[in-house]
Curated annotation (Swiss-Prot):
NCBIfam families: asnS, PRK03932.1. InterPro entries: Aa-tRNA-synt_II, aa-tRNA-synth_II, aa-tRNA-synth_II/BPL/LPL, Asn-tRNA-ligase, Asp/Asn-tRNA-synth_IIb, NA-bd_OB-fold, NA-bd_OB_tRNA. Its EC number is 6.1.1.22. This is Asparagine--tRNA ligase. PANTHER family: ASPARAGINE--TRNA LIGASE, MITOCHONDRIAL-RELATED (PTHR22594:SF34), ASPARTYL/LYSYL-TRNA SYNTHETASE (PTHR22594). Keywords: Aminoacyl-tRNA synthetase, ATP-binding, Cytoplasm, Ligase, Nucleotide-binding, Protein biosynthesis. One of its GO terms (biological process) is asparaginyl-tRNA aminoacylation. The keyword Protein biosynthesis applies. It comes from Streptococcus sanguinis (strain SK36). Belongs to the class-II aminoacyl-tRNA synthetase family. SUPFAM superfamilies: Class II aaRS and biotin synthetases, Nucleic acid-binding proteins.
Length: 448
């Protein structure tokens, strides 16, 4: 078979022409003189139709019957070259169909373990390397890819430079209880929790920088929102105000949603995501509310029928139920700003005139997805930062490079970070974060 391979997503450019597709058989059906193949190649899913009389006419009775019989006996995930004529088909969700004229088996797939029937989560996770091939998991990866693409596009357009922070570090970014420790030639080293501290050095050199890579948190959490290894985008910038930072974060999240709408609309359709709701999140301004206003709201509504959360006092941190209620109350992504300094990281800058609160923000996504962005202005004053670290009992000698940034030309600066997997689950409308990354690492799972 002479092969100029065309991807499924591009068949629309070949209507009326004969093409060859390299694909896998996702499913098959039919009876008698007709067979239907559901084909996938990573770019899209596509139906091919084979008619027995056409094969007999083209190849003669013996060879034509043999080829048609081969099609009817194809097993799930067999890899094939399929040749046929592309036709428009209004009945198809894809809009096109392939009138199959020839087929060649590349790799057999006998006893494929993930059949169309229902399987338990543990079984699917044990076979994650194969589960990734299913229609919904392909859609999740397409959405993830669109978000990553939109991230690079957004920051490039806004004057940010990609800056690579190290994954191995000699100190902790925030919580030392959640570190993965390893031996670095006789010296303790840690897998990165965040690239932020190094990114601040980048901002002092380059003005606006962003990092994108894996981070690691040794959290012993089994919730649907936590992974021990995930991908984070951190951005850091000099000379931006807190309000300008919130504007940037809002524009970024809207750009990510728009990027998925533009680049992966079929993935959203596969997952049955409410596209009109996503469009509303783009069209409407995000809500901004202070931490203290949020606490007041929670207290005022804690006896409501839908208030499935525990009582909080001013100074307490939010749990997932509180975040869910707040974002659902406003119906759009909501910034909660100016948290108590006591429950936030040491490097956050106090609110002018109110040292008990810091210039920070968490962006809470509606529909129960909770926090997707955390950010703050950083304390740029050397003496103030050292005093804060001393109050917390921190060893300042471990942060000499970080403190140097305040000694040599310090400037107002800030930044934020977003866990890509949380953004993927939010945009995709799925409930568990394990499906937002190819091979999830969780408390009790490190394989495959």
């Amino acid at each position: 078979m002479s092969k100029k391979i065309v991807t499924i997503i591009d068949v629309k450019n070949y209507v009326g022409q004969e093409v060859t597709i390299g694909a896998w058989v996702a499913n098959k059906s039919g009876k008698g003189k007709i067979a239907f193949l559901q084909l996938r190649d990573g770019s899209a899913f596509f139906q091919g139709v084979a008619f027995k009389p056409n094969f007999i006419e083209k190849f003669g009775e013996e060879e034509g019957l043999a080829k048609f019989d081969t099609i009817k006996k194809l097993s799930q995930e067999t890899s094939v070259y399929v040749t046929g004529v592309v036709k428009e088909d209004e009945r198809s969700k894809f809009g096109y169909e392939l009138d199959i004229t020839d087929i060649e088996i590349i790799g057999e797939s006998n006893d494929y373990p993930i059949t169309p029937k229902e399987h338990g989560t543990d079984f699917l996770m044990d076979n994650r390397h194969l589960w990734l091939r299913s229609r919904k998991q392909v859609a999740m990866m397409q959405i993830r890819n669109a978000i990553i693409y939109a991230t690079y596009e957004f920051f490039d357009k806004n004057g940010f430079m990609k800056f690579d922070s190290p994954i191995l570090s000699g100190n902790a970014a925030e919580d030392s209880t959640e570190l993965f420790e390893t031996d670095y030639f006789g010296t303790p080293a840690y897998l990165s929790q965040s690239g932020q501290l190094y990114l601040e050095a980048g901002a002092m050199a380059l003005g606006r920088v962003f990092d994108f890579g894996p981070v690691f948190r040794a959290e012993k959490s089994k919730t649907r929102r936590h992974l021990t290894e995930f991908w984070m985008m951190d951005a850091e910038y000099s000379y931006l105000t807190h309000d300008e930072s919130l504007d940037l974060q809002e524009a970024y999240v809207k750009a990510l949603i728009q990027g998925v709408l533009d680049r992966a609309p079929q993935a959203l359709e596969t997952l049955e995501r409410d596209v009109e709701l996503l469009k509303r999140y783009i069209a409407e301004p995000f809500k901004r509310v202070s931490y203290d206003e949020a606490i007041d709201l929670l207290q005022a509504h804690e006896n409501d029928e839908d208030a499935d959360y525990e009582h909080l006092e001013h100074g307490d941190d939010f749990g997932s139920p509180h975040e869910t209620w707040i974002s659902n109350h406003f119906g759009v992504p909501t910034f909660v700003v100016n948290y108590p300094a006591a429950i936030k990281a040491f490097y956050m800058k106090p609110v002018p005139g109110n040292p008990d609160r810091v210039l920070c923000a968490d962006l809470l996504a509606p529909e129960g997805y909770g926090e997707i962005i955390g950010g703050s202005m950083r304390e740029e004053d050397y003496d103030a930062l050292v005093a804060k670290m001393n109050d917390l009992g921190m060893d300042t000698t471990e942060y000499e490079f970080y403190l140097d940034l305040r000694k040599y030309g310090t400037v107002p600066h800030g930044g934020f970070g977003i866990g890509i997997e949380r953004m993927v689950t939010f945009v995709a409308g799925t409930k568990h974060i394990r499906e937002a990354i190819p091979f999830p690492r969780m408390l009790h799972r490190i394989k495959p």
